Amino acid sequence: MEALKTVERFRVIRTIDVAVTCYPERTYKAALTAAQRTVRRLVKKDLLRRYRTDRFQTVYGLTKKGADWLDEHGVEATSSVRRVSDMTNPEHRLWLQFLVLCAEARGLKALTESELLRELNRGVTDVSRVRQGYLKVRVQRPQGAIERDLRPDFVAFEADGVTWGEVDRSKRGAEREASLAALVGAIGRTAADGQVVRRMVVFCKTERIEQRALAVLRHLALELAHHVLIEGRFHLRETEPGIFEVWTALLSPLPGGRSQLVDTRIGHVGVQRLPIWLPKVRVDSSNRHSTAGWFNENYLPYRKDGGWG
């Protein structure tokens, strides 16, 4: 049932989504083998239908029979095959929902961008009050600074705050690079739902995209290091390749009603590769792709300071 509920939720899935949802405790090859068996069985029963996208990705949609089966088992559902058949390149949505499922496999609540917007606007009837952004930031541009409402590709909620996730399938232009720098400056601030943004992770499809994102952050770190750390300013410190700590100065009370500024780490920023090799893995001896990055490592849904335990 979990596999069918997942395709009802996202409307389109890959086999790797079933591996994450149903078999995250297994090794990757074992999880993939079990997921392939599950998907084949559901396709044979006409509960799922298989499609190939223009980019030669195999995806699955929920059939009318599959939706009826879920309805009979207490899950409201509708067929998605017509919508899936019209999709040409759903790669971005496939990756962000994969990362959401990975976060949930770690025991976190997680939402895609569209799910987050629905939650932010639940019960809102006045169109003028509909929220389109999750966090307001000040973006520096050559023409001057402007305020922008930004929203993540996905979010994951941890005990200390929220993780803001970005999926970069292409190199950022100047506008998006400026937005990336602005988001770093927003670490530690409160988002529209009252959650504090503690982490931002940028997932990059290629090494070139990854290196450019790292260059933006390293340049920002050098610029910020020239300024003394005081309240309202922040420093960005790379502690290991692709992982940065965000520091600021916060007032700490002293005896006698006095206070002092104390350097305080308020969050993290990470840059890492999308695990595009995982869907390419074959379970037989012909496999030439790595299985690195599965749940036995500190990689999914994102690299975490101190690991996942």
Regions found by a protein language model. Name each.
Residues 22, 39-43, 99-107, 184-191, ...:
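Hydrophobic, Leu/Ile/Phe/Ala-enriched alpha-helical segments that form helix-helix packing faces
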Residues 29-39, 143-150, 197:
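Glycine-rich, flexible loop segments associated with nucleotide phosphate handling
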Residues 174-178, 185-309:
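Non-catalytic C-terminal interaction segments of nucleic acid-processing enzymes
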Residues 1-86, 308-309:
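Nuclease-adjacent, charged terminal/linker segments that flank catalytic cores
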Residues 73-116:
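Amphipathic alpha-helical dimerization/coiled-coil segments
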Residues 104, 109-164, 169-176:
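Active-site metal-binding core of divalent-cation-utilizing nuclease and nuclease-like domains
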Residues 34, 91-95, 175-179:
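Soluble or luminal CAZymes and related metallo-dependent hydrolases
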